[in-house]
Amino acid sequence: MEKGGAASLQPGSNSDDDAAAQQQQQDIPMYFVSVNKVPTQVICFGDQCSGLVATDDAKPVVLVIPGNPGSIEFYTEFMREIYEGLKGKVIVWGVSHAGHVAPPKPMQIPNVEDHPTLYSCEGQIGHKLSFIKQYIPSGAPLILVGHSIGCHMVLEILKRAPELNVRKAFLLFPAIQSLDACPRVSIINPLVTYLRPLTVATLSALRLLPRGVQNLLIRLYIFLATACTTPHRSSLRGAVNYFRPECLMACFVFTRDIIQNVRERDNETIARHADKLTVYYGQNDHWSPVEYYDDMRRTFPEADVRLCERGFRHAFVLDRGVDVGSMVRGWIETLLR
């Protein structure tokens, strides 16, 4: 789909959604577009667009880049809070990672085994750059919001596309260094490598269960992994994608790649763009511990580096998306004055 066209725009519910789930999604401006030949789920809050191409190149575009797994549906309430809180002063868009969300029929995700480079970390960075160049006017003020591994992608966008009019970049709970040293890697790594066929087969079989049972299993997993007891329904909808083998495979390729390759923090890019960055670390973050915050403060004493004092978890989108969205909305409001 070229800039200005809308031929590939598709409604956002996936092929397995039942009537109740579709009803819940009616108020979410969700679509699928083709980016690098991969059907990609996007959410677009804002009336200044024509088929997802910005028509007002003076209005700032807030672009949200997710963590992993990368369904942008996890971020629905976070994005809505930013958009509604700023009363239409900005456009708020979010783009899923390539292959992480099942598109509606007849669209299909390119086979992961035949096209692994589409779903690697490098492929996902290229996917975000292509989305920006395809749908956002080159002169439009751009505010980047990355979460977790999405922060790594934000830094890569700043490095690789200096022509973009990036006004600000917010890095939330950044996973930008030493991912192989994180404590959960010892559990995750086998699941995405030699146990991958068994993991994919087992989780894919669960899609045959009724949606209510799937949601119960998702809630149980979320509780065991994060201690969250009240995940928002948008989190449940986003998680259902990972009962699909093609989405699991894309997610696993990406996970393995970032564990292997996201090691050294890109101090050069951070230094070059320090005036544009706000970096927000968590108090109890297994992907980015407080020691990384301390080191960032020592290395960049003049940068805007903050430590969470409100008890937000790394996976804040599960149940605190509105609260974190309100915080980010306040930061953006200050920027717009």
Locate each region found by the language model.
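Short, surface-exposed "cap/lid" segments of acyl-processing enzymes
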Residues: 36-109
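Catalytic active-site module of serine/aspartate enzymes centered on a nucleophile-bearing elbow/loop
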Residues: 275, 301-337
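Active-site loop/oxyanion-hole signature of alpha/beta-hydrolase fold enzymes
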Residues: 97-143
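Short beta-strand/loop motif that positions the catalytic acidic residue
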Residues: 273, 279-281, 285
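Acidic catalytic loop of the alpha/beta-hydrolase fold
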Residues: 261, 283-288, 314-315
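Short alpha-helix in the alpha/beta-hydrolase fold that links the catalytic acid
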Residues: 77-78, 266-267, 275, 289-298
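Gly/Ala-rich beta-loop-alpha elbow adjacent to hydrolase catalytic centers
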Residues: 145-150, 154
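Flexible "cap/lid" loop of the alpha/beta hydrolase fold
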Residues: 159-201
